[in-house]
Structure formats: C-alpha cells, structure tokens
Amino acid sequence: LGDVYKRQVLIVAPLSGHHATLLRDTVRTLLQDHKVYITDWIDARNVPVSEGEFGLDDYVHYVQEFIRFIGAENLHVISVCQPTVPTLGAISLLASAGEATPASMIMMGGPIDARKSPTAVNNLAEQKSHDWFESHVIYKVPPTYPGAGRRVYPGFLQHTGFIAMNPQNHLQSHW
C-alpha cells in the first residue's frame, strides 16, 4: 500500500448544488491505485446570505488551498465538468507565483473555450438573454433553509439537465 499512497489524486467536483456522490464510481476506481481526495461543497441553500457571495475568485482560491493543504508533490488534479475553469485558473496562478504545482491536471468534460465544439447548452446560451436566465433558472432559497433569500441556480435543475441530455446512461448507472 505504501506505493499506492505516493500517488495522490484530488478530484474537484462540480459545485452546482449536487454532491460529490455523483462521482462515486470514479472515486471507487481511483482508490485501487491512489490516495483520493475529493471536494464536497456546502449546498448554497445552507449558507446564510449574511456570509456574503461566492464567486469565481473564491472558487479558484479554494482549489489553491486544497492543493496547498494536500501538497503538490505527487498530486494529480482531476476536475470534472464545471470546475475545469477554476481549476485551470488555480493551478495557473500557483505556477505564476512560483509555487509548487501538481504533477498533472486532468480536465474532464468542462468547457475551457465553449466556442469550440458547441453543444445544445451553448446554443441555448446564445439564443436566450441574460435576463431570461435570471428569470427562468435563478431562484431564491425558500425560508425553511438557513440560506433563505440567497439567489441560486438549484442543483436539481442542473441534475435534471444532465439526465435529459443522456437519460439512458443515467438509468443504467442506477439500475
């Protein structure tokens, strides 16, 4: 087992309201040969509005902190979908500051340049205005949660979108 734990992986999971459990098969596979770390973000509905906003800069900073905490030596970072851009930013900023950087950075399924190989999501983004998205996919957290009033893109919408794009794969992965 000693050699296994020399190889470390940080999986940077998506932030958008669902949990890292969606990556359990990836983690299970990587655990055979690596010490695995994975991010699991607090659902925004549980963060009081008084805690302030959370933006791209914060996301990048957290990824940097994870890398520093684990240690970049023998670390491989895998970002899955949404966090590819913040992960690229975090590692690039570490490098530009002369800090240690991971041995590798693997970006899976994330749009670094969404203009290349556009998808149905890109087409929707080009067809609809910013105001349309604000009024159709951004909701206030209900009063029953600590984050009441916080404006969020709910994870259930993201997850439903994933299922709608490839229903057969999702059905097979759970049955």
Language-model segments: residues:
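Short, small-residue-biased leader/transition segments that mark boundaries at the very start
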Residues: 2-5
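Short beta-strand element of the alpha/beta-hydrolase
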Residues: 7-14
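Serine-hydrolase catalytic-loop signature spanning alpha/beta hydrolases and amidase-signature enzymes
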Residues: 16-18, 36
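The serine-hydrolase catalytic nucleophile loop
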Residues: 19-26
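Conserved alpha/beta-hydrolase
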Residues: 30-45
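Conserved acidic catalytic loop of the alpha/beta-hydrolase fold
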Residues: 46, 58-75, 88
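Gly/Ala-rich beta-loop-alpha elbow adjacent to hydrolase catalytic centers
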Residues: 79-84
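Alpha/beta-hydrolase-fold enzymes
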Residues: 86-175
